[in-house]
């Protein structure tokens, strides 16, 4: 099992991120995506990989992590052009899958940019189609996609579960 925690540049609820970290940090690699590096800096996390065109991250924070990467040789930067066919988060997910990810936990994938939120939810389907378990977590939701039978466990703090078909015919047996 190879787990990744991706901290993207959307709205990050520090409580839900801390829950992800508590559950998965010891066995996971961490990828910061563009402005997600600000969250890493705020909570003192040194990511394994930093991906982005850095159009929304503080130049000072990016500079601090670049210096750290030169000294430590354990932080990988994936610099992207601002004109590209994929979002920064999409590139981070592709990077994790290329490294053999089996589970991906994403924080900061929802927020004020509806276009990015929708794109990120669509990325869950790409992960499911490739056999990778991927989850977007924020302070109100845990979102995933499945394309086969799955058992579901109750998560503490969540009272409801919704099933929404995405991209085709779905049958639900309860």
For every predicted segment, state its role:
Residues 41, 97-100:
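Non-catalytic positions within long, well-ordered alpha-helices that form the structural scaffold/packing
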Residues 59-93:
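Glycine/small-residue-rich loop that forms an oxyanion/phosphate-binding "nest" at active or ligand-binding sites
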Residues 1-67:
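N-terminal beta-strand-loop-alpha-helix module at the start
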Residues 172-174:
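Conserved small/polar residues in nucleotide/adenosyl-binding loops
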Residues 126-143:
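Short, acidic/small-residue loops that bind anionic groups at enzyme active sites
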Residues 7, 31-34, 52, 78-79, ...:
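General beta-strand structural signal in soluble alpha/beta enzymes
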Residues 117-118, 146-164:
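Short, glycine-/small-residue-rich phosphate/pyrophosphate-handling segment
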Residues 111-125:
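Short Gly/Thr/Asp-enriched flexible loops that form oxyanion-binding sites at enzyme active sites
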């Amino acid at each position: 099992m190879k787990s990744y925690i991706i901290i993207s540049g959307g709205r990050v609820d520090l409580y839900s991120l801390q829950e992800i970290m508590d559950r998965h940090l010891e066995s996971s690699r961490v990828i910061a995506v563009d402005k997600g590096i600000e969250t890493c800096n705020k909570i003192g996390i040194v990511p394994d990989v930093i991906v982005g065109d850095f159009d929304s991250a503080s130049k000072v924070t990016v500079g601090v992590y670049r210096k750290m990467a030169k000294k430590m040789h354990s932080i990988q930067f994936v610099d992207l052009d601002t004109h590209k066919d994929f979002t920064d988060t999409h590139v981070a997910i592709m990077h994790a899958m290329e490294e053999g990810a089996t589970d991906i936990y994403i924080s900061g994938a929802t927020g004020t940019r509806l276009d990015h939120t929708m794109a990120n939810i669509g990325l869950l389907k790409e992960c499911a189609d490739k056999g990778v378990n991927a989850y977007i977590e924020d302070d109100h939701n845990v979102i995933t996609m499945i394309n086969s039978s799955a058992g579901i466990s109750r998560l503490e703090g969540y009272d409801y579960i919704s099933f929404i078909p995405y991209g085709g015919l779905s049958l639900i047996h309860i």
